[in-house]
A protein has these predicted regions:
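Mixed-charge interfacial surface used for oligomerization/domain docking
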Residues: 3, 11-25, 30, 36, ...
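Glycine/charged-rich beta-loop-alpha catalytic/anionic-binding loops adjacent to active sites
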Residues: 55, 83-87, 111-122, 264
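Anion (oxyanion) recognition and catalysis
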Residues: 20, 79, 113
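Short glycine-aspartate micro-motif
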Residues: 5-7, 85-87, 267
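Short coil/turn segments at secondary-structure boundaries
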Residues: 58-65, 89-96, 125-126
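N-terminal glycine-rich anion-binding loop in soluble enzyme alpha/beta folds
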Residues: 5-71
């Protein structure tokens, strides 16, 4: 009889109660900010981390989970009698974590040469609850008797059409991290320019620029409507950093799409370290990219 584990990392942004409900195993990233090492999901709450970023002098940096850490986790599964582990780490193009997991498989063969654990390593090509939600769906279906090959195929098919629109209300973090120039950030702040950014297949792109905070939510919703027009089984989620505009985005989405979001969730430390602590995100079903 199969005994299956689902393993991911803290970039998934799965709320703790959902992780416990579906038995999702989450390994935490370390985030360094102003010489202080924070363990995501352990050292502080998301809200506390947003406040620390706003007050920080420097830029947060994240450390990839190491091959040794992954090997130890795989060994644990072997020792506990698991037959399979579905391992979905952070987007491969944005971190060395995926490659570290590959290295750990070789280390496992040395540590447990007689092991029979099947490791299904998947690249979600994205971040946050864009894949976190569907890991929970995967766990639910496995519990109801679905085959591993079936849930993996469904997951990969779903990831092929998921998109994110980001609305940052401050350019401070992007300036610090070098994602935009200091001059562009200063001019943007002075003129109230806000970029509307898509995150698709792990790549960011500025799709539009609006002037004034009140234009951000309408632009995000309009872009989502354009990119998802004609999509069957459309759904959406809202990510946030506990800012007032979260409510504005949810109201606008309910009106535009005629349905509530699957989930309203907090952006975790790894994600907000890149987007900044004053950001809302609209996650939605787009067209398959093939």
């Amino acid at each position: 009889m199969s005994k299956i584990a689902i393993l991911t990392d803290s970039s998934c942004d799965i709320p703790q109660e959902m992780a416990e409900k579906y038995g999702i195993d989450i390994m935490s990233f370390h985030i360094l900010l102003d010489d202080v090492d924070y363990i995501e999901r352990e050292s502080c709450t998301n809200t506390e981390f947003y406040d620390k970023m706003r007050a920080a002098k420097g830029v947060p940096s994240t450390a990839a989970i190491t091959p040794i850490q992954f090997c130890e986790k795989y060994c644990q599964y072997v020792d506990e009698g698991y037959t399979d582990v579905i391992h979905v780490p952070i987007n491969k193009s944005g971190s060395s974590t995926y490659n570290n997991a590959l290295m750990a498989q070789g280390m496992l063969r040395e540590e447990r040469p007689e092991h029979h654990l099947k490791i299904h390593l998947l690249d979600p090509h994205t971040y946050s609850m864009v894949f976190g939600w569907y890991l929970c769906e995967m766990a639910r279906k496995l519990k109801n008797g679905a085959e591993i090959s079936h849930v993996i195929h469904e997951f990969e098919t779903q990831m092929d059409c998921m998109e994110i629109v980001l609305g940052p209300y401050s350019l401070k973090q992007m300036k610090k991290s070098g994602r935009i120039s200091a001059a562009a950030a200063v001019m943007g702040e002075l003129m109230g320019i806000r970029p509307i950014i898509t995150l698709i297949d792990g790549k960011t792109r500025v799709e539009a620029k609006v002037r004034g905070d009140d234009k951000v939510v309408p632009a995000m919703v309009e872009l989502c409507k354009q990119r998802s027009e004609g999509v069957e089984n459309f759904d959406y989620m809202i990510g946030h950093t506990n800012i007032p505009q979260t409510t504005d985005l949810e109201k606008a989405c309910r009106k535009a799409f005629g349905k509530p979001p699957l989930l309203v969730f907090e952006l975790g430390g790894v994600v907000s370290a890149n987007t900044g602590p004053d950001t809302v995100a609209l996650v939605y079903t787009g067209h398959p990219r093939g």
